[in-house]
Amino acid sequence: MSNKYDLAIQRKKEIVAKYGGKNLSEKLNISHPAVSKWEVIPQLRAYQIASFGYYKLEYIRPDLSF
């Protein structure tokens, strides 16, 4: 990976694959197409996904400082 943003792109793919796009959208109470449009997981959604307990915030978005 060339930088942390590229890593965040890969982490988005990993997390969506683990939860499933449709299931993740239901857990976040948003539409499935909204999840599909993400290049990386938005900061607010990263907080919500971290609250599920499987991934830490820093893992989900390594390109941001929290």
Residue ranges and their predicted role:
Residues 13-14, 29, 46:
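Exposed boundary/loop context
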Residues 43-60:
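DNA major-groove recognition helix of helix-turn-helix/homeodomain DNA-binding modules
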Residues 23-25, 35, 49:
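Short alpha-helical "recognition helix" segments of helix-turn-helix
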